[in-house]
């Protein structure tokens, strides 16, 4: 029990030392802010920080409330205020404050206020906060607590040296020791110690009054009004907190709130230099507020001077008075018309930048051209432009007077904070003027003339627009004529549909076979020539396999070998093939064909005299005998040159196409070909240089038809490397020619 009582007494003594030393560091005239660094080492050394039996002879009697704490009573918060004492100033002195941009703000005259609060310290024993109640440690180590308090005092001493009040005191010392010029504009210049920095100790449990002084909560600079910083403090204040020290009786806390601006200046208004230097500045900054007083003073002065003159000179005096009043009135009107650059404005989040200007200033000419954003989705003016007064983009703000625009383009007007109408989605080459058809030219001319009369449009552009409208009216060829009741587009559409229906039966097989041919040989697709058409390319997706080709391939009796070797221009041959297939569509109801398979070339390609008869897609019924004979010859040549037939050549398929199904495995990186719902025309071509070589080879093969098999193999090997078919697919647009 004795040991616990001794520990408790030591803790209570540390709490008393905390309040006393903290107050001494802030209030004592021997604090670090008033002495040089060498003296500070002697006054606030390690011995002073570690000795907790310091006497309090220099502190006021009010500190006795916090000097004998027994652990049972409630200790009120201890408040220490640091202020600038103005009691020595007279009515001729003017106190001003300079902000961070160098602008001077009037604070008060010498006798209006006695104090300006600079700092407010809060020292307390917190035993009711959730932080203290949630602390789980019950026992207190006295040595550890003493070390923590020493660390707190050292941190407090460093913080005091960094606060703005210390810099203000250093300026005071320089002004006292330097040349004394009352009229100069140097900070805190006066003839003697008229101002000083003092402190006072207050009871935090009682209300703090600000009568006769400028309290800490009052902003001197008006731009700080209605604005808060990150810690929910007024913008002209800042706050620092020291980490609290835990004891069993509560948390020992120290915090400070202080002014951010500290560059005060004191000037004597009776000085001639000061009056000459600052008369124009104060007149412009206060202008409209001080004008009635100046007029009253001038009238009184004139009334006092009038008895000194004779009665005969009174008319002349009245004329001079009138002239002087007129001059003053002109000066006032000129000052009111000028933009108040030096006027102190109270900016808040809800303040409009144009609300400080008279209505005559709001009628400004803004350029009507705005940056075009064709790919931006959403409204342009969805946010109010007044949130940021420094924002230079005032295009979102509507003009004040626009009667002509509101009459014709009502939805385009936007109130502040709302979005612009739908017309902002598309940009017009005439600004806000909409385009109309020239059927009613008189009405459109009137609308354009009304819209052009907007104050936002320059005079030159108005004349240009009127000349352009007159030019449109003078040329009737430019008028847009509405379609008559005959509906010729419908006739063209019906003709196209009829042609499409006629082409459908003849191209059903071809469209399916083309899609199959695209998936047969992936190795040769890279070497195909580019098509002249604009049709979409087939999609490529993961692997899908065909079980068999279309059942129409089993119709071998009616099948014809569709091998086209066109010469010359590929587009011309493709167009002719479409014409032939269109003309002969009525006679080709029973036509069918084989899909052209990309692969190794067989010897049947060298019979040029036989194949030239089939250079068109449409084959008439008169050539059935020729087809059979050609197929028989191809079959014979295939059996003769069996070693030269490629597994995926046309001859290999033609020899076995009578089967109902031909299993062909689909490569893994090709998707199932999509058969389009529309019909496509296609033709197979080879390059012109290949046609000449193949013609020569076909002649040599006809002369040496019974030659050696090895020669045939050599020809087939060369053609396998060079004789890739080039696929041209025409566009899906139907030809208008019959």
From Swiss-Prot:
Source organism per UniProt: Saccharomyces cerevisiae (strain YJM789) (Baker's yeast)
Alphabetically ordered keywords of this record: Autophagy, Cytoplasm, Phosphoprotein, Protein transport, Transport
Region (Disordered): 279-359, 377-462, 521-605, 690-719
Region (Interaction with ATG1): 432-520
PANTHER family tied to this protein: AUTOPHAGY-RELATED PROTEIN 13, PTHR13430
Summary of the function given for this chain in its UniProt record: Activates the ATG1 kinase in a nutritional condition dependent manner through the TOR pathway, leading to autophagy. Required for autophosphorylation of ATG1 at 'Thr-226' and its dimerization. May also be involved in the regulation of autophagy through SNF1. Involved in ATG9 and ATG23 cycling through the pre-autophagosomal structure. Also involved in cytoplasm to vacuole transport (Cvt) and more specifically in Cvt vesicle formation. Seems to play a role in the switching machinery regulating the conversion between the Cvt pathway and autophagy.
Cleavable signal peptide: none
Subcellular location: Cytoplasm; Preautophagosomal structure
UniProt PTM comment: Phosphorylated; hyperphosphorylated by the TORC1 kinase complex to repress the induction of autophagy. Starvation and TOR inactivation results in ATG13 partial dephosphorylation leading to ATG1-binding. Rephosphorylated by ATG1 during prolonged nitrogen starvation. Also phosphorylated by TPK1; TPK1 phosphorylation regulates the association of ATG13 with the PAS. Within this regulatory network, mitochondrial respiratory deficiency suppresses autophagic flux. Hyperphosphorylation in rich medium is impaired in the absence of VAC8.
Example of a GO biological process term: mitophagy
Keyword ATP-binding on entry: no
Modified residues (Phosphoserine): 344, 348, 355, 437-438, 461, 496, 535, 541, 554, 581, 646, 649
Main location group: cytoplasm
Name of the protein in its database record: Autophagy-related protein 13
